[in-house]
Curated annotation (Swiss-Prot):
Region span, Disordered: 1-24, 115-169, 181-232, 310-351, 372-397, 426-708
Null mutant phenotype: RNAi-mediated knockdown results in no obvious phenotype.
Feature: compositional bias, Basic and acidic residues: 117-129, 526-538, 546-557
Species whose genome carries this gene: Caenorhabditis elegans
Annotated Low complexity bias: 312-323, 688-705
Known partners and oligomeric status: Interacts with tax-6.
UniProt tissue specificity: Expressed in intestine.
Biased composition (Polar residues): 8-17, 151-163, 189-208, 324-351, 426-439, 607-619
Protein name, UniProt field: Calcineurin-interacting protein 2
Length: 732
């Protein structure tokens, strides 16, 4: 992802040209951040509600939100690559560690409301002369209560020898930032390396690696042996954060709009991932057994408000985690299922999540109900059941038959048992029929069934329901928009054989009702021509299946686009002009007839004067003289030559007609028909052979030939007649 940018920055920061850097270019430093990152699986596996939660910007009350952090989101890219954003280049020299994890929690409302204590204790702080840098201990181990070490490990040169227990209680990190901001005004200026500073960098290189692994209940020296043990188990992403040094806001390098940014500082962050402490499945899989246990929980309790606190699943396993009083909102909490007794405590108190990390939001995946079906019964989030989960809920709920390959009956699933009949807006759009687990055969045929289904009349199903071997099409999935037939057909009265055996099965084996509707067996896939024009209506081919006694061609009225080769009825309607009726535009078939009769949309009926009607016509349908886009006043020469070519001696004065405004062509004609000076122009049809049309208008292009041709083309696309294929020889 960052490869291009690495090289770009490397070439930029070479020492060969130190002076032509941008004025704001700060010294890039190396920050280390520990994140216990539990992958949340590909984005598609989560229902949209949860994706929304993952995307949402955490809200916090403004007075407790550090101003630097407010706009930053920590996110995952779709590939589960974490984007850890660091506030800006202005603070690069100050930041040893940006986050106090507690601060992050307050900031996202995951944890306690911020404590007011430190604010009152502030005067004590003035005693310390040296600025204190905090390295926040990384995500503590499971059994450690979070509350003891609010302020992390103090790393001021004087304090570095202290063990954790001796720490004074200090304000959370962001308040210290605000103080530091006030203290040194020019934060951009890199500091001269003093002895303390060099000490600090050494400490950052050495000791920080230990600090990463501190189990915060132990003292800092105890953690050193733990380092080698952990190091092989975890992986590091070196993460480049690019900061726009003018605005001070971080940005994601991959985006196109940012590609040319010149004034960007690169901060290097090492993000350490430990494989999550409870193995991943435990953290985010919903397994069936647990869900059965929780089934009695009321649905309304499963819908936490977004801003509510989210308990991590592993809370109940750490007995030492400390309870704390909280506002009533978080009563709507699911007790974690390992320890049902937490139910009582949840109402009065809540436990701290013991594994806190910036990026980890997957508690929400555990606790927020997936709204797909509102009950908690759900099969494991795994590809198979997810597939059937998406497909079947709505299938069952709309009472549509689910054809399934009967032979694989053992693995079939009765979704009516697993899910209540509740359609969900998300799944109704994706109706797909779940295939039973192993059927690879079924994949090939879904296309056929899709094209067949749509064209099938509704009553067709009743014919062979009782035949001994029902022909069920193999289906991988119906087209995403369920066809009309599926919505309309009600399931037949008989129960499918698999339903009757339900008592013999343990409820964990889920089964699908096989509905024996007789579906038309798969013929050869119809070619687009067959679908479109009904061209090869070969009855012997269509009806060679027993029980299929209806002619199929009537069911294929598809005209998918404009049919290029017109069908019979097209040419028929073309030959009979209904010259006396005005048919409104919005009805396309009638519209076609109308356009043939009144070729010009300029002339409305009432404007045809008797003298005009008596004019000899070369054919029934005079061709429109296309001037849609021409300048409103055509030159006189063009007009005269037109009239000469038609042999019309005296231009007649048109009667006045009001033509509604919203049809621009007619409107223009209306304006022209009111100019007494200009004679009414009659279109010369194609029927006057081209050499009759005036030589003058042919010799030089008229007002706007190109534009006109474009409009001719538009006009032709609107009516679907053979004329489309003639070269456009209209006299222009």
């Amino acid at each position: 992802m960052n490869r291009g940018y690495d090289s770009y920055n490397r070439s930029r920061s070479t020492s060969s040209r130190p002076l032509d850097r941008e004025p704001y270019h700060a010294v890039s430093e190396l920050y280390t951040k520990e994140i216990t990152h539990t992958p949340i699986g590909p984005a598609s596996d989560l229902p949209p509600e949860i994706l929304d939660i993952l995307k949402e910007n955490p809200r916090a009350t403004p007075q407790y939100t550090p101003p630097l952090i407010r706009h930053r989101e920590n996110t995952w890219t779709p590939e589960n690559y974490p984007i850890v954003r660091v506030p800006s280049a202005q603070f690069t020299d100050v930041m040893t560690e940006l986050y106090d994890y507690h601060e992050v929690e307050k900031y996202t409302h995951r944890s306690v409301t911020p404590d007011y204590e430190p604010l009152r204790k502030e005067p004590e702080l003035k005693e310390q002369k040296l600025p204190t840098y905090q390295v926040i201990p990384p995500t503590p181990e499971k059994n450690t209560p979070r509350h003891q070490h609010h302020s992390g490990i103090t790393l001021s040169p004087s304090d570095s020898s202290r063990t954790l227990g001796a720490l004074p209680k200090k304000p959370p990190m962001y308040e210290e930032y605000l103080q530091m901001q006030k203290k040194d005004e020019n934060r951009n200026i890199p500091r001269q390396v003093s002895s303390a500073d060099s000490q600090r960098t050494i400490r950052n290189n050495n000791e920080l690696s230990h600090l990463r692994h501190i189990d915060s209940s132990s003292s800092s020296e105890a953690s050193e042996p733990a380092k080698d043990l952990d190091d092989r188990e975890r992986y590091v992403y070196t993460h480049d954060v690019y900061v726009d040094s003018t605005t001070g806001r971080p940005f994601t390098p991959g985006r196109e709009d940012v590609r040319e940014k010149k004034n960007c500082d690169k901060l290097k962050i090492n993000v350490y991932f430990k494989p999550p402490h409870p193995p991943v499945e435990i953290t985010y899989k919903l397994d069936e057994i647990e869900i059965e246990k929780n089934e009695n929980i009321v649905v309304t309790k499963l819908r936490p408000s977004r801003s509510d606190t989210i308990l991590s699943r592993s809370v109940s396993t750490s007995p030492s985690s400390v309870t704390d009083n909280i506002p009533k909102t978080s009563t709507s909490r699911i007790p974690s299922s390992e320890n049902p007794k937490t139910m009582e405590h949840t109402t009065t108190s809540r436990r701290f999540p013991t594994q806190t990390s910036i990026l980890r939001k997957e508690h929400e995946i555990v606790q927020v109900p997936l709204h797909r079906s509102q009950s908690l019964r759900q099969s494991r989030i795994s590809e198979h059941s997810k597939r059937s989960l998406g497909k079947t809920t709505s299938t069952v709920s709309t009472e549509r038959p689910i054809p399934i390959h009967v032979v694989e009956e053992t693995s079939s699933i009765d979704m009516d048992v697993v899910f209540p009949k509740m359609p969900h807006h998300q799944t109704v759009t994706n109706v797909r029929v779940p295939s039973s687990r192993g059927s690879a055969i079924s994949r090939a045929h879904s296309e056929h069934r899709r094209s067949i289904d749509r064209s099938e009349p509704r009553h067709h199903h009743r014919h062979h329901v009782h035949s001994e071997t029902p022909e069920l099409p193999y289906t991988r999935g119906i087209s995403k928009t369920p066809s009309v037939r599926e919505y309309n057909v009600k399931r037949e009265g008989q129960r499918s054989p698999s339903r009757s055996h339900r008592s013999e099965r343990s409820p964990s084996e889920v089964r699908i009702p096989v509905t024996t509707t007789h579906t038309r067996p798969i013929a050869k896939r119809q070619s687009p021509e067959e679908l479109d024009y009904g061209r090869f209506a070969d009855k012997s081919q269509q009806n060679r299946f027993p029980g299929d006694h209806q002619a199929r061609e009537e069911d294929l009225p598809y005209t998918r686009g404009i049919s290029k080769t017109p069908s019979n009825q097209d040419s028929r309607s073309e030959r009979t002009p209904c010259s006396d009726i005005h048919i409104p535009y919005n009805n396309p078939e009638k519209e076609r007839a109308y356009q043939q009769s009144e070729r010009s949309s300029y002339r409305s009926h009432k404007s045809v004067t008797p003298s005009e009607k008596s004019l000899p016509r070369n054919s029934e349908t005079p061709e429109l003289h296309y001037t849609r886009g021409i300048s409103k006043t055509p030159s006189d020469r063009v007009e005269k030559s037109r009239y000469l070519s038609r042999g019309v001696s005296t231009p007649h004065t048109p009667s006045e007609v009001h033509i509604p405004y919203n049809n621009p062509e007619k409107e223009r004609a209306y304006q022209q028909s009111h100019r007494p000076s200009s004679p009414k122009r009659r279109p010369s049809g194609r029927t006057n052979s081209p050499n009759k049309s005036s030589s003058s208008s042919k010799a030089r292009p008229s007002a706007a030939p190109l534009e006109e041709i474009v409009h001719i083309k538009e006009r032709y696309e609107r009516d679907e007649t053979i004329r489309r294929f003639f070269p456009t020889t209209t006299a222009v």
